[in-house]
Amino acid sequence: MVQVNENYLKLKAGYLFPEIAKRVKLYSQSNKNAEIIKLGIGDVTEPLPRACIEAMGKALDDMGTTDGFRGYGPEQGYAWLREKISEHDFISRGCQISPEEIFVSDGSKCDSSNILDILGKDNSIAVTDPVYPVYVDSNVMTGRTGDALENGTYQGLTYLAINEANNFLPELPEKKVDILYLCFPNNPTGATINKEELKKWVDYALQNKSLILFDAAYEAFIQDNDIPHSIYEIEGAKDCAIEFRSFSKNAGFTGVRCAFTVIPKNLKGLSSTNEEIELWPLWNRRQSTKFNGVSYVVQKGAEAVYSLEGKKQVRGLIDFYMENAKIMKNKLQNSGYKVYGGDNAPYIWIKVPDQMTSWDFFDFLLQKVSVVGTPGSGFGLAGEGYFRLSAFNSRSNVIDAMERIINI
């Protein structure tokens, strides 16, 4: 009989969001008339930008002609999209990222997991706590951790707590760590980091020859001018960081699927014989072998994000969701809740009432007012006592949900 990858057996009972779905399903089955409002998973609700729809429609028409048909595309992504990304997302902010250093993909979730394919298994790893679960689970699946402990953490990982005491900004590791996962604006806490603080991480990585895996999936939601949108705004970051970006939240591509990863050409790692190896060729080889590229139609839709009309429409989507976040934060704060995030990110991070755990508060909101959020403990040990609400929903649902919660 075939042997299984036993690393999967080390995973905790269930991925956070399937567990939420299971509880919601049980509740809805016994409360068939309940009007459930879901503010849990960060999935968008508003239609795609018209510029993207028109671009994809034209691309489909192109595919119906002999001259316009496209088969397999380049694994790295079409040059015309990578050029737009380079110009608008990086060069415009003073980051010297070339189109050649950009790899178009079908999701930053995939890339932040798949990047482990080109990194050795003996690297030491640090994650924030709480943390986006994918960073931890992907390391467990590939055998980079020990067993799960009773408190839900894994042997072999370094956890960097983020909480009220440190303004949800992690402290630098006390010892040398090879791989550092950072996500800003942060999921789940909604916290942001300024250039001075981010420079400390870049300096640490350069000093220790560490690699930063920087998730900037929510950079488009930044409102404050002094907050960096890219780690490459920090001098030296091209020598120590890989950045993940996505069209999912800013342009509503969660169901369309398009993202990109930046791997600078001069970024290097070490072989077992201490030979310096460039990471770009390794990732290019990995993608060429395991990935067929994002469809021509989808990439044309992504290109339209950078058109004049596309930019206006994307800005409209971002403003809509951030107004939702503002409404949520104001309503909850005015009713006595301690609330964080929501100013430069589409997530609200709530301190749950005393005597309740995160899952207690989840069940409380579900049973009392049919509102679904995400228990903070699902993001890590330090997330216990907190609760995440997403601003990705209709305006009427957001207002209704807040009225239900504050009137319990």
From Swiss-Prot:
EC nos: 2.6.1.83
UniProt family annotation: Belongs to the class-I pyridoxal-phosphate-dependent aminotransferase family. LL-diaminopimelate aminotransferase subfamily.
Species for this entry: Prochlorococcus marinus (strain AS9601)
Binding annotation for substrate: Y15, G42, K109, Y132, N187, N292, R388
Sequence positions bearing N6-(pyridoxal phosphate)lysine: K249
GO molecular function, one term: pyridoxal phosphate binding
Entry function: Involved in the synthesis of meso-diaminopimelate (m-DAP or DL-DAP), required for both lysine and peptidoglycan biosynthesis. Catalyzes the direct conversion of tetrahydrodipicolinate to LL-diaminopimelate.
Top EC class of this enzyme: transferase
Needed co-factor(s): pyridoxal 5'-phosphate
Keyword Endoplasmic reticulum attributed: no
Domain of life where this protein originates: Bacteria
Protein name (Swiss-Prot/TrEMBL): LL-diaminopimelate aminotransferase
Catalytic activity from the UniProt record: (2S,6S)-2,6-diaminopimelate + 2-oxoglutarate = (S)-2,3,4,5-tetrahydrodipicolinate + L-glutamate + H2O + H(+)
Residues engaged in binding pyridoxal 5'-phosphate: Y72, S108, K109, Y132, N187, Y218, S246, F247, S248, R257, N292
